[in-house]
UniProtKB/Swiss-Prot annotation:
Segments traversing the membrane: none
This enzyme's EC code(s): 1.2.1.11
Role of this protein: Catalyzes the NADPH-dependent formation of L-aspartate-semialdehyde (L-ASA) by the reductive dephosphorylation of L-aspartyl-4-phosphate.
HAMAP family given in the database record: ASADH
Protein's recorded name: Aspartate-semialdehyde dehydrogenase
Pfam families found in the cross-reference section: Semialdhyde_dh, Semialdhyde_dhC
GO molecular function: aspartate-semialdehyde dehydrogenase activity; NAD binding; NADP binding; protein dimerization activity
Classification lineage: Bacteria, Bacillati, Cyanobacteriota, Cyanophyceae, Synechococcales
Binding of substrate, residues: 157, 236
Length: 338
């Protein structure tokens, strides 16, 4: 059994931070010490962990002393601010933000896809974007059998992707609309209840938003396949938690549907959900709180002989963020890569 290590959660009070806390407990992660770090306004408060109330500390230059591992989920600016302090303290940072994902020397890791990449870290390992992780876990089993040439993906992203306050905003907007009031938007740019809109991340020079470009660039890096052609359209939808994606794949030659179903059903981190007679396939409601990515509606693309279509749903706070980070941490401990 691996030796227990000293862990800090940076951003412990956020949606991903609290999920990290739950996962470390439920997966019996080998902890020698657990330190909860957040902004000064949360300092002095407590969070429960395995029956104990742990104090939250304000992050400062000495906060990482003695830590072996830091699970960072406080946003890109915070990760950049403290990365040097963390690595100087001798700890490894598993970072959930986008700050370091495309830095060439920083591994971008999904344990079901490229676990060996974690071995080459220089003190920082990046956790991919939620939509990238969910799609990657679902389609990598097919890529292993026959390299994917092109991916066309449309996402249906829940409010929780914008944080806990966005979820509350959608609830309030729903009540307002049902009571005949005009819904107000403060966290998201527009009312999301009974509505949807293209993802609200900044638009880039090529007219794709940043969220869409993350899917393109990160998938290529994780798959170590710069030649995959990828296009994405990301949409925010009025669902509280769990993202969904419609994915079209193109291969060099026809890919048998039954082979695809078998490969996905056997793959780690994925669950095949299909009942064609009942028209029952993955739904965000079913994926919420689940570790596995739910995949279904696998079918031949009638517009292309070498194409497949599939539908997936996954909890972006768990596998799309916190669970993937904990799995990376487990990998580092089990293989002695800290």
């Amino acid at each position: 059994m691996p030796s227990p290590i000293r862990v800090a959660i940076l951003g412990a009070t956020g949606a991903v931070g609290t999920e990290l806390l739950e996962l470390l407990a439920s997966r019996n992660f080998p902890l020698a010490e657990l330190k909860l770090l957040a902004s000064p306004r949360s300092a002095g408060k407590t969070l429960e962990f395995q029956g104990e109330k742990l104090p939250i500390q304000a992050v400062d230059g000495s906060a990482f002393k003695g830590c072996d591992l830091v699970l960072a989920s406080a946003g890109g600016s915070t990760s950049k601010r403290w990365a040097e302090e963390i690595t100087k303290a001798g700890a490894v940072m598993v970072d959930n933000s986008s700050a370091f994902r495309m830095v060439p020397e920083v591994p971008l890791v999904v344990p079901e896809i490229n676990p060996e990449a974690a071995q080459n870290h220089q003190g920082i390992i990046a956790n991919p974007n939620c939509t990238t992780i969910l799609m990657g876990v679902a389609i990598y089993p097919l890529h292993q059998l026959q390299p994917i040439k092109r991916i066309v993906v449309a996402t249906y992203q829940s409010a929780s992707g914008a944080g806990a306050m966005a979820m509350e905003e959608v609830k309030h907007q729903s009540r307002d609309i049902l009571e005949g009031k005009i819904p107000q938007a403060e966290i998201l740019p527009y009312p999301l209840a009974f509505n949807l809109f293209p993802h609200n991340s900044p638009i880039t020079a090529n007219h794709y938003c940043e969220e869409e470009m993350k899917m393109v660039q990160e998938t290529r890096k994780i798959f170590a396949a710069e030649d995959i052609r990828i296009t994405a359209t990301c949409v925010r939808v009025p669902v509280l938690r769990a993202h969904s994606e419609a994915v079209n794949l193109e291969f060099a030659t026809p890919f048998p549907v039954e082979l695809a179903k078998t490969a996905i059903a056997k793959a780690p981190g994925v669950k095949l959900v299909e009942d064609w007679q009942k028209n029952y396939f993955p739904m965000p409601m079913d994926a919420t709180g689940q570790d596995d990515v739910l995949v279904g509606r696998i079918r031949q693309d009638i517009s292309h002989p070498n194409g497949l279509d599939l539908w997936l749903c996954g909890d972006q706070i768990r596998k799309g963020a916190a669970l993937n980070a904990v799995q990376i941490a487990e990998l580092l401990v089990e293989r002695g890569w800290l």
